[in-house]
Every structure is written in C-alpha cells, then in structure tokens.
Amino acid sequence: MTGPRPTTVFLVRHGLPTSGEHIDPPLSETGQAQAALLGAWLVHEQPVAVYASDYRRAWQTAAPLARLLGLEVQQRKGLREWASSRTHYVRPEDLAHTPEGRAFAEGRFEDFVPDHDRVALRATMVGELRGIGDRHPGQTVAVVSHGGALNTLLASAVGSERPFFFNPGYAAVSRMQVWPDGRLVVASVNETAHLAPQRLRAFLTNDKAATE
C-alpha cells in the first residue's frame, strides 16, 4: 500500500520587469524572454495548475507556461509581494547608489527589507501553499510570486527567522513539497539552468535553434 504523496510545487520569481513607471509594471523584453524560456523548460514537468500573484510581472511570467499546457493562469492576491510605501516599482539593482541598495548588494538583506507585517506575510504565503496542496494532492503545480514573498515562504519552511536570506534570480525556480499534514519541505533553491546566458541571447535574437 502506498502512503500519502506530497504536492510538488515549482516556486518561481517573476521575470525582469520594467522599472520606475508605476507600482505594477509589466515585464521588460528580457523578462518576456525569461518567461518564455521558463515555460519551455517547466512544461516537461507537466504541472496540472499554474498560479501567480495578480501583479502583471508575475502573471505575465506564468502565461507562456500556461499557454503550453492549455491552462489558465489562476491569479491569487495572497501571492503578492510584501507591502511597501513606494508609489512606483523600483528593481533592487536600480537602487545601487542608495543605502538600501548597497545593503542589498553586500548581502545585508535585513537592511534592505522594507518595514512590513512579516508575520502576516508569512502566514499568508504558508496558507496559500497549504491550500494549493489541499487542492492538488500528490500532483505538480507551478506558482509565480515575488522575491520577498518567496524568501518569507522558504525561510518558514527551513525554520529561519530571517525574512530575506537569499537573492532569487529573475524567473529562477525553487522546488517545494507540500505534504498532506501541512509540512513544507524545500527540495531546491534558485535553479537557473533554463536561463543560461546563451539561451537568453539566442531568444532575444530569434535564434530559436540555440534555445533548444
């Protein structure tokens, strides 16, 4: 007799967005290429559902994969990034000359994280993942969210109190198992093989043979 099987969740940070326009920017050209490469790679895992936050940079990242699978992207507010007082989106790398940008570059992530309700964000992200596990027992699912939100989730799973302990790449993938008893088990963090520079360059120059 086989025992209970976990739900396998591919956790994805959104692709590279534009910056400085408004609070909910779309993907940049590079971000669109990252999303396409992600979809071409992850489709072989045959997710039965594709979830994303309702911010454009997240659901646009999920869209190519969903298209290849013949699925709709299920948008969830609970997968949003942490709240911020900013009125427009700024990519971390565009803050290089600010104190918080220097903290980010030096790996002092605690000094980069904005003041927000960390307990609430952690509870929301853990609740979202457990809900996905309940809806898709023993199946495979893809989830596109945000760097801070994913850090919070992964930190909870490994028992870390730090709200931001690594810098996930754009369109990078981490793998998590959601067990029927609610346990969250991290299987991998920050996979980027599908985003090899030569593949990204080839996609941007329409050399499709080199992306295969």
What label would you give each PLM region?
Residues 52-53, 123, 144-145:
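Short beta-strand scaffold positions
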Residues 44-46, 132-139:
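Glycine-rich phosphate-binding loop signature in dinucleotide/nucleotide-binding domains
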Residues 46-78, 99-103, 177-212:
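Conserved histidine-centered catalytic loops in small-molecule metabolism enzymes
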Residues 160-185:
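Domain-level recognition of soluble alpha/beta enzyme cores
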Residues 26, 69-127, 187-188, 199-200, ...:
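Phosphate-handling substructures
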Residues 17, 149-150:
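Short active-site segment of divalent metal-dependent hydrolases/proteases
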